[in-house]
Amino acid sequence: MKPIVYMLLFCAFTVVILGHPNNHGALIPHHDKLPNGESCTRPGYSCSESSQCCTPVDGETFTYGCGRAWMEGSKICYICNRESSMC
């Protein structure tokens, strides 16, 4: 019984330390302001349209938008590689 409890605790700590695997491009460099000077919505946060989302610094390699997240009911901002099939 003890090994099972230890294994569950290890898994729980691993999830807490490593965090959620879907970061929606938050680690990709992006601009924090819109061209009009207003703040933009960071990747992974809720939005209603693409114009609210932060744009990637490298616009040729990465694309951005506001779309439905898998297993979530709301729309969120995302940044992903243009050549990735996971976008």
From Swiss-Prot:
It is found in: Secreted. Disulfide bonds join C40-C54, C40-C77, C53-C66, C80-C87. Expressed by the venom gland. Keywords: Disulfide bond, Ion channel impairing toxin, Knottin, Neurotoxin, Secreted, Signal, Toxin. The keyword ATP-binding does not apply. InterPro entries: Cys_Knot_tox. Residues 1-19 form the signal peptide. Coiled coil: none annotated. GO terms for molecular function: ion channel regulator activity; toxin activity. Transmembrane segments: none annotated. Its main location: secreted. The keyword Ribosomal protein does not apply. It comes from the Eukaryota. GO terms for cellular component: extracellular region. Probable neurotoxin with ion channel impairing activity. Belongs to the neurotoxin 27 (Jztx-72) family. ICK-41 subfamily. The presence of a 'disulfide through disulfide knot' structurally defines this protein as a knottin. This is Toxin ICK-41. It comes from Trittame loki (Brush-footed trapdoor spider).
